[in-house]
């Protein structure tokens, strides 16, 4: 649970964990408030929220390398469908806010002219009014999966509450799953997989981007999910610039390029 790039620190108790960060402009406490307001089996139970963080139930962490990623992906979607996506969107979206946010990131980090042109072309190709709008978790990656002791129920930790720039649109969550399918956890943390013993029904336990595509309602939502995946990866660059080796930053730029190949 001490993974991540936010700078948060953790204090462990017998049945709970305290998460705190004094340098994130209140992001951690807002996360705790969101969890408390949206309590369900899909997310951690929050016991208290304070100025710089919150205290939540203690959960079991199973190493990424031992997870059957196909089974976990299906479990993430099931929990989101039942407890998160089934709720109404709460944050009004501003396309201009999204455009401005992406422009700021492109101004700070050089990802190449081809990626910038792809972003513009893909944004224009999407029918944004046709996309499913609902409450979103904001960060349902494989890395944010834990399990409830005693029941082994899948729990998705560390939500990122929606904003006008990163809104309550289901494609935002699908884009995060695609980020994992591209290998985010392997690139960021150097994780490897031991999937041979975990293979089921003769198929690999590892996921690829097209497993995520099966959860999109149509090509339009898939296009939006790929776009949001690229935006999510761009959003990691400021954090990685502070706490990750240059190779990790270069590899994430490579992931951005890979993601742009999923659409014609």
Feature names for model-found ranges:
Residues 164-217, 230-247:
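Active-site activation/catalytic loop segments of kinase-like enzymes and analogous catalytic loops
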Residues 38-43, 59-138, 143, 227-234:
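Conserved kinase catalytic-core helix
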Residues 37-53:
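Conserved HxN/HPN-centered segment at the entrance to the catalytic loop
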